[in-house]
Amino acid sequence: MPKVLVLYYSAYGHIETMANAVAEGARAAGATVDIKRVPELVSEEIAKKSHYKLDQAAPIAKIDDLADYDAIIVGTGTRFGRMSSQMAAFLDQAGGLWARGALNGKVGAAFTSSATQHGGNETTLFSIITNLLHFGLTIVGLPYSHAGQMTLEEITGGAPYGATTIAGGDGSRQPSQIELDGARHQGELVAKTAAKLFG
């Protein structure tokens, strides 16, 4: 039974919701799953003024936690076409793990959100995936076996590189059923891939 970490940063709750769906998919495939978040860099005062969602249940991750898992699925909102500074600052601390090869051969994946359809989801996925490849992870995307990402019936996230959601400019749009199904599907695929590699 593979051990999977869903590691995320969520300012407004959209990625937290996606992280829970990713975890559901991995658990459905038989994995043991932990959901953890990275530390907030913004002061509590500014976070409150900006209406950040501060009541998130997931515990704060420590960088050495990464070595304890067979698979690591990373999610963060898009910040100007790349991952958030909170996630980048966390992953930048993994130099010691990288130097020891502690993450080599693990399974990795990425998911994200943006305000608009063309708001940088794919480039953000690439920024996460690039980090994971440098760490030595084998990447699992979101293939078109998740047919929902092909729909033209509604605005929806999803890319072959990872699950995505679109939050809207004011953050009022929550992840749709199609987007949550994509997140679950990706979590399931990661768990199945890790099971093949690690038993």
Curated annotation (Swiss-Prot):
Enzyme class label: oxidoreductase
Catalytic activity, EC: 1.6.5.2
Binding positions for FMN per the UniProt entry: 10-15, 78-80, 113-119, 134
Family that this chain belongs to: Belongs to the WrbA family.
GO MF annotations in UniProt: flavin adenine dinucleotide binding; FMN binding; NAD binding; NADH:ubiquinone reductase (non-electrogenic) activity; NADP binding; NADPH dehydrogenase (quinone) activity
UniProt: substrate binding residues: 98
Free-text remark on how the cofactor is bound: Binds 1 FMN per monomer.
InterPro entries membership: Flavodoxin/NO_synth (IPR008254), Flavoprotein-like_sf (IPR029039), Flavoprotein_WrbA-like (IPR010089), FMN_Rdtase-like_dom (IPR005025), NQO (IPR037513)
PROSITE patterns in UniProt: FLAVODOXIN_LIKE (PS50902)
Binding annotation for NAD(+): 12
Needed co-factor(s): FMN
Source species: Caulobacter sp. (strain K31)
Name this protein carries in UniProt: NAD(P)H dehydrogenase (quinone)
Pfam family, one: FMN_red
Keywords: Flavoprotein, FMN, NAD, NADP, Nucleotide-binding, Oxidoreductase
Reaction equation(s) it catalyzes: a quinone + NADH + H(+) = a quinol + NAD(+); a quinone + NADPH + H(+) = a quinol + NADP(+)
Domain Flavodoxin-like residue range list: 4-190
